[in-house]
Amino acid sequence: MLPTLDARLSAAAELVRPGEPVADIGCDHGKLTAVLAASGRYPKVIGADLRPGPLAKAEQTLEYAGCKDRAELRLGDGLSVLSPGEVSTIVLAGVSAQTTWEIIEKAPWVSAQGGPRLVMVPATRHSDLRRWLWEHGFALAADRPVQAAGRWYAVMAAEYTGKVKTPTFRECLFGLTGQWPEGEGYAAWQKAKLPRLRLGVPDGTELAKEMDELIKGESKG
């Protein structure tokens, strides 16, 4: 039986390009790994996790889905389980923004021309991940807002270009989510957090001014 994906993982699956090898890093119980493998659209599917327990669950998931022979499971830390160039897309779902960029930083071959597409679903700090990606030479190819279990998530795809960008606070807050019908709801959720964040920003700064404008609703997300 094929597992059911929530909105986050469904959106992530749609950003994996058909016909190319893919790795699901931090695969947990292997739901996304199983769906990708069962589709038959990818020449190689790798699921990896740091912990033996979840990886054993992932093996069961693949078996129940009838696609155990179409995916390879690996035990290891982050991208250390992969060889440079082994896959064209890397999925990093369900970890924090900081953990996401720390995983990327430990694999220099990812931050290179012709490197893999990164599909990311940060559990927290969406704005910080966008800023990190832009400041480290990555371009956002997709930035889709989705709701799952009553929470908003941003499902991002990024590719290394080497072009460093210094983004504004507003760009980091909303990214490209305004391109989607769900963008209005995501923007409202992001704005709702601003009053608390504003407390830690000194008055008179450009950041304070931009935050105040957003809080007052003078700018739309």
Each language-model region and where it sits:
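S-adenosyl-L-methionine
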Residues: 1-20, 34, 56-84
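Conserved SAM/SAH-binding beta-strand->alpha-helix loop
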Residues: 51-53
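Conserved SAM-binding loop of SAM-dependent methyltransferases across substrates and taxa
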Residues: 29-42
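Short SAM/SAH-binding signature in class I
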Residues: 86-94
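Class I S-adenosyl-L-methionine
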Residues: 2-7, 80-81, 86, 98-221
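Conserved class I S-adenosyl-L-methionine
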Residues: 19-28
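Conserved SAM-binding motif I beta-strand of class I
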Residues: 44-49
